[in-house]
Amino acid sequence: MATTATTTPSATSLTTLHRRIPLFPTTTTLLSLSSSSKPLFLSLSSTRSFPTHLYCIKKDDIDITFFEQDNPDEEITFDPPEKPEGYIPPRAVDEPPFESEEEIALAYEELYGAAYSGESLLGNDVYAMDSKIKKATGFGSKSKKEKIRDGFEENVVQVRRVTKVVKGGKHMRFRAIVVVGDKKGQVGVGVGKAKEVVSAVQKAAVDARRNIITVPMTKYLTFPHRNEADYGAARVMLRPAAPGTGVIAGGAVRTVLEMAGVENALGKQLGSNNALNNARATIVAVQTMRQFSDVARDRGIPMEELWK
């Protein structure tokens, strides 16, 4: 029967196989916390690193000094500087300004001129108009329009729908012809276009006020002499009439004469029946008329000698 031989490891071999490796390597220099002046360093790795110097400073070496004029126990207070001569303290938010409203208005007028009052020679918003007011109450706005009160009456001669053909289609708008006058010798014809009838009439009224002319008339409210004029294909003939005759004319010619204040006159359309051209032809015929006094002054003779 065979026997089995077993070997028992010795203590030396176990120590060699199972050697304990320390977690942190041992330092080559002992750590000392004594109050020596020699610097110490602490190394936690096997690699060489620069030492960290630790110095011990005695508390008695620190000297705390104070200025002779300062007292640490005294409370510190701040004295503001003195106010210069002529210093005016700022006013509070709720206090009124030092100047009155009249002084402020005069200073504003000296710098920027007179403020816009909203009124012009021919009414408000005709020649001068603020941009914000024009945007709020301009043409096409939904706000209520204020009628211009300047002594002129308005008469709509014609309102038609016009079409502009473009590449993308047709643009349809309304064209209005308006005659304005004060029936005292002032009359004007204007044209306006807009997407709405009301806006077109308002534009035409403003345009007519910008083209006001003076009509020469005698004391019998008629023309001083006969005259003819044409505008485009329209031709208009005007003749003076005796008192009590009235205005014998038709279409746009009659409207222009009535708004000008003519009460006795004869008018006739000889060419085209276009309302705008006939109205403008009437304006041209009236503009070329002259008073007797103007003719006598140009000739250098008294007015009584004109009929000799």
UniProtKB/Swiss-Prot annotation:
Pfam families: Ribosomal_S5, Ribosomal_S5_C. It is found in: Plastid, Chloroplast. Gene3D superfamilies: 3.30.160.20, 3.30.230.10. Coiled coil: none annotated. Keywords: Antibiotic resistance, Chloroplast, Plastid, Ribonucleoprotein, Ribosomal protein, RNA-binding, rRNA-binding, Transit peptide. PANTHER family: RIBOSOMAL S SUBUNIT, SMALL RIBOSOMAL SUBUNIT PROTEIN US5M. Component of the chloroplast small ribosomal subunit (SSU). Mature 70S chloroplast ribosomes of higher plants consist of a small (30S) and a large (50S) subunit. The 30S small subunit contains 1 molecule of ribosomal RNA (16S rRNA) and 24 different proteins. The 50S large subunit contains 3 rRNA molecules (23S, 5S and 4.5S rRNA) and 33 different proteins. uS5c binds directly to 16S ribosomal RNA. Belongs to the universal ribosomal protein uS5 family. This is Small ribosomal subunit protein uS5c. It comes from Spinacia oleracea (Spinach). The lineage of its organism: Eukaryota, Viridiplantae, Streptophyta, Embryophyta, Tracheophyta.
